[in-house]
Amino acid sequence: MMRAFYIGRFQPYHFGHHAVITRIAEEVDELVIGIGSAQKSHEATDPFTAGERVLMLYNALENLPVRHYVLPIEDVRYNSIWVHHVASRTPRFDVVYSNNPLVIQLFREAGFCVKESPLYVRERYSGTEIRRRMIAGEKWEHLVPKPVAETIKDIDGITRLRNVSASDSNFSL
């Protein structure tokens, strides 16, 4: 049995992530999906909590044809111990999928087999671009699976994102 690991911040989970995970699922028997920077939320670049992101993925991946686990992974201060940190919080895995140079380097140094993730149209499917559209009031729902858009609406995520992204330069005490 082949079990793979894939990590992302998923702020928010979008069709680019979905395409990558769907392709990985064609090559493995099980998939461990790490919600990276799990401790971060309520920030302009990380507006959603780990629990909200778990829910987004759980709902969006309901029909994924392989067994999968969605687990929060907090950051650690030292890159040299990060792989051990990840491994201690996940089921054992045989291969890591990533295009992130640091993730690739750290897992290879730790002796893991690393494969590059299948590519997607990053210019179109980007968490940064989706968050920008949300703040600007532009259409964004077509860039994420329907259950993700529903989750964001249910938690009033756009209001939160706008509030945490707003400057307080016009306010004085």
Swiss-Prot record:
GO cellular component, one term: cytoplasm
Tagged with keyword Cytoplasm: yes
Record EC number: 2.7.7.1
Annotated InterPro entries: Cyt_trans-like (IPR004821), NMN_Atrans_arc (IPR006418), Rossmann-like_a/b/a_fold (IPR014729)
Pathway: Cofactor biosynthesis; NAD(+) biosynthesis; NAD(+) from nicotinamide D-ribonucleotide: step 1/1
Keywords: ATP-binding, Cytoplasm, NAD, Nucleotide-binding, Nucleotidyltransferase, Pyridine nucleotide biosynthesis, Transferase
Keyword set includes NAD: yes
Gene Ontology terms, MF aspect: ATP binding; nicotinamide-nucleotide adenylyltransferase activity
CDD domains: NMNAT_Archaea
Compartments, as annotated in UniProt: Cytoplasm
GO biological process annotation, one example: NAD biosynthetic process
Catalysed reactions, semicolon-separated: beta-nicotinamide D-ribonucleotide + ATP + H(+) = diphosphate + NAD(+)
Domain of life from the UniProt record: Archaea
Pfam families: CTP_transf_like
Enzyme class label: transferase
SUPFAM superfamilies: Nucleotidylyl transferase
HAMAP family: NMN_adenylyltr
UniProt family annotation: Belongs to the archaeal NMN adenylyltransferase family.
Protein name listed in UniProt: Nicotinamide-nucleotide adenylyltransferase
UniProt organism field: Methanosarcina acetivorans (strain ATCC 35395 / DSM 2834 / JCM 12185 / C2A)
